[in-house]
């Protein structure tokens, strides 16, 4: 998120309530900006709500067209991209945090909006580690709530299988646990 300046006066929406979206929402909320996390999974949205972050399901959020200064697309789905553009105000910034997975097209996107409304599009990867580590050290970002399951290293193969299952956020391997 270092490639975009987010100020406390900004309205920011994050699309996607997976690991990436939850982390982005927490980091953005620290700026003081009005932060909305949009997702489909009640249990994941509750994680953000416990941190004081506003949440919506996609249908409710869709009513807030052209309201946001910055929209972060972290769902990895073409529909997330389309929805992000609909939420963005003219001269807003669309941040792409994930690549699109699986089938689907973004043909429904009104490409003229990028030009007419002067939309900025920013691709954003993981960024520098030290600022992230500093936030973790201060306890500013809650990562414990993102750990769905823990396993000893001896069960590593099973843990890897579990990590790929729907609904599992993060799986933690403890090398010295039994």
Located regions from the model:
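Mid-domain Rossmann-like dinucleotide-binding core that forms the NAD(H)/NADP(H) cofactor-binding site
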Residues: 1-60
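Phosphate-coordination loops involved in phosphoryl transfer and adenosine-cofactor binding
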Residues: 8-11, 68, 118
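Helix N-cap at the beta1-alpha1 junction of Rossmann-like dinucleotide-binding domains, i.e.
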Residues: 42-44, 78, 101-102
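A short acidic, Gly/Pro-enriched loop at the edge of an enzyme's catalytic core
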Residues: 62-71
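C-terminal hydrophobic helical "lid"/dimerization subdomain
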Residues: 82, 128-178
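Helix-to-beta-strand junctions that scaffold the AdoMet/dcAdoMet cofactor pocket
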Residues: 88-90
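Glycine-centered, small-residue-biased loops immediately flanking beta-strands
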Residues: 92-93, 169
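Rossmann-fold NAD(P)-binding glycine/threonine-rich loop
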Residues: 99-118, 129-134
